[in-house]
Amino acid sequence: MVKLLDTDIMTREVLEWEGIHLFHFHGSSCSQKTRICFNLSNIDYIPHVVDLFNGENYTEYYLGINPRGLVPTLVYNGEVHIESNDIMRYIDNSFEGPKLFPNNNDSIIYMDHLAKVEDDLHLHLRALTFRYLAPNELVRKDPDALDIYEIAGSGYVNGSTDERKSIEVDFWRKMAVDGIPKNQTIAAIKSFEPHLKEINIRLGNNKWLLPEGFSALDIMWWINTYRLKLLGYPFEKYSNINNWHETLEQRLSLIHI
């Protein structure tokens, strides 16, 4: 789990905060995952909306909390946690409520595998979102803002130079020049295909992605299919995923994401 060290954090005031604080953005798929976990466990938190369209995640203040400039970020009694899947696991370990992470070794291994796949696909999901859903003029970053983003914040996660930030900078600089070109779009679509096939087969034999029942893995992948459906992805060929998705959508706590 990604809990920042004291030396990673430059916005020092959050180290004195008490209670549960969640920095998030309503349209962010990663933020949606964490809000679902809080809702399922009936956990009250203090929300801090970070407007990604207005570049609030690139401010010195926010980069001092999350050196990557991503949402969500959890601050709990002065401890700072980043990365949505890690925050979900932290919630599961730290608070009362339904347990969404497995104890069975085989399920742990499979969950870690498919959670990493989901995380690795995030830039592809972002590319498809920007190609088909979000207007380019809203999401493209000004070069001056990118210059600030590149140097602001500590640049460290867990005391080490953060390589993830350079990946983010590269994505945004290319998009500022080229938008999301057709070849990138095709590559993004193809990147999902083998994993959707795997999940569709698995859901043919199980109601949920893990044999124990509903889990955080279902939340992670439901958010992906939710976004892909908004983008018009043809799920007709994945009937098991379609049925699973509709079952989850009927859960009230998942509808309000």
Put a short name on every predicted segment.
Residues 123-246:
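GST-like fold's C-terminal all-alpha helical module
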Residues 88-92, 111-115, 193-196, 200, ...:
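Non-transmembrane alpha-helical segments in soluble domains
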